Amino acid sequence: MKYIPHDYQRHTTQFIIDHPESAIFLGMGMGKTISTLTAVNDLVRNRFETQKVLVIAPIRVARDTWPAELNKWDHLAGLTVSPIIGTAKQRQAAANRRADIYTIGRENIPWLVKHHGNRWPYDMVIIDELSSFKNPQAKRFKALKKVRPKIDRIVGLTGTPAPNSLLDIWAPFRLIDNGQRLGKWA
């Protein structure tokens, strides 16, 4: 299918390209995924600034939505995806498979960090549903924070940036900007 972006989608894609640390707040159905994939396509294929992309998402979104979106659009043909889903053995095989984009359920981030150890291979990370990383005590937050210095580009996506308190804002942005704006409290 041919992708004809709206102006705001074009702006979103360019924003991701221009800003290695970005948070995208767009409502449901506004095209966060396609805008982000278009930026990834440009960064991987045209600018050669990114080698391996990791998408962290709810399990169904990681398994179904991102691969389907990648296969849906003509301009993304040729980008490859490997969903890191299933048993530990299946996840290990998927993580070791050659691909441009890897998708994983957020509950498996501690496993992935342990699996790769000091050889973290993903130079770009996309957190689909950034608001799910608001608890700095959660294992997934701690694991991602551990490898954050090895990540060159990070994008947080959400349609619902609705914090219950100021502390709910801190953790997601600690991951995005590595504590530059709101501090490194945890």
Q: Residue locations for each model-derived region?
A:
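PAPS/PAP-binding and catalytic site of the sulfotransferase fold
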Residues: L37, E69, S165-I176
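Interdomain motor-coupling "hinge/lid" segment immediately C-terminal to the ATP-binding subdomain
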Residues: G159-T160, R174-A186
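SF2 helicase/translocase NTPase motor core
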Residues: M1-K150, K184-A186
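Helical "lid/switch" subdomain of P-loop NTPase nucleotide-binding domains
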Residues: Q137-V147, P161, S165-I169, Q180
